[in-house]
Design a protein with these regions (language model features):
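Rossmann-fold NAD(P)-binding glycine/threonine-rich loop
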Residues: 267-319
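NAD(P)-binding Rossmann-fold cofactor-contacting core
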Residues: 194-216
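Rossmann-like NAD(P)-binding element
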Residues: 230-253
């Protein structure tokens, strides 16, 4: 029987085993390979597992072991998913795949977190209603999310026209934090032809990501801005992907003008344990701009699991059961 697992340290808190079990109703074993020694973890993978997820601090080390690299891994230079194939070990990046899937969903008006009767979004858990709404639509986008990059021209994804996005121009995506997940998010947005603004506390890291994106296609734009310009860039962006674990100083001071009115604004935050966008801030955003929406990190987790698990097994997992886990 095929076995799958997760390597990284620490990983005892991970939701991955429960998500995988739910996705396939316990059909396949999925285990935590808990050790701080990467070589030990990798050896255990080779000697007993069909595929593994990889989390911090092993993503770059795992990338270096791969015999075959997916397009996104070649650019991101990190992997969170290794699979045994007849040709060797193949690396993927399901952070990229999950964000790309979410971007395709919001392009159709899905992935929004609904509010309660008081107008406050509950971000301490993923909204089952929001996930169910996205789930009903996302399966048809999985194949598109896994397609190779569009290098031929700068265009909206999957043949959509700009009007299909609800924008009168190519969307501008602000990526805050360009570490592992942030770089994957930036590459996902770039692969769909979006204009990018990148910011990171270490500006050199953001510049390196911008250089990688330019090499994808010289028509792609990735502007690097310092963190002090967060508020200005937030106001300008149509899509914000927030990847840092703490709130930037300007976050709590965002105003109605920053949230905009009369046009969609989509926010995705990676951190689901202690999010920086709290209920008060989201309520202010929704009151300022009813077309703005916030998606919490558990939806990102769900989407990267959905795309990654299908690579593992060749079978689409049950998204309804996975949703119940988070």
């Amino acid at each position: 029987m095929k076995r799958f697992g997760l390597i990284g340290h620490p990983i005892a808190h991970s939701l991955s085993p429960a998500l995988f079990k739910a996705g396939y109703d316990g059909k396949y074993p999925y285990e935590l390979i808990e050790t701080a020694d990467f070589e030990e973890a990798y050896s255990r993978f080779l000697n007993g597992y069909e595929g593994i997820n990889v989390t911090a601090p092993f993503k770059e080390l795992a990338y270096s072991k791969a015999d075959i690299l997916s397009d996104e891994c070649r650019i991101i230079r990190a992997t969170n998913l290794l699979v045994r194939t007849p040709e060797g070990i193949k690396a993927y990046n399901s952070d990229y795949l999950g964000v790309r899937l979410w971007l395709q969903e919001v392009s159709e008006g899905f992935g929004k977190v609904p509010t309660t009767s008081s107008g406050t979004a509950d971000i301490n858990r993923a909204s089952s209603d929001a996930v169910a709404l996205a789930s009903a639509k996302c399966s048809k986008n999985i194949e598109a999310a896994m397609t190779p990059f569009e290098h031929s021209e700068k265009a909206c994804p999957s043949g959509l026209s700009q009007s299909d996005w609800g924008f009168r121009k190519v969307p501008t995506t602000l990526v805050v934090g360009t570490g592992g997940a942030g770089k994957a998010a930036a590459v996902a947005a770039a692969s769909l032809g979006m204009d990018l603004i990148l910011m990171n506390r270490s500006i050199g890291k953001a510049e390196a990501v911008a250089e990688s994106i330019f090499h994808m296609h010289d028509a792609l734009q990735a502007e690097v801005r310092p963190m002090k310009d967060f508020r200005e860039c937030f106001r300008k962006a149509d899509i914000i992907i927030y990847n840092i674990p703490t709130a930037v100083p300007d976050l709590s001071g965002l105003t109605s003008e920053d949230f905009g009115t009369g046009k969609p604004k989509f926010i995705l935050e990676a951190n689901y344990k202690d999010p920086s966008f709290d209920n008060e801030l989201i309520m202010k955003m929704k009151q300022s701009n009813p077309q703005a929406s916030y998606t919490g990190g558990k939806v990102w987790l769900l989407y990267q699991a959905l795309t990654g698990y299908e690579i593992f097994t060749g079978e689409t997992p049950d998204l309804t059961r996975m949703t119940a886990v988070i």
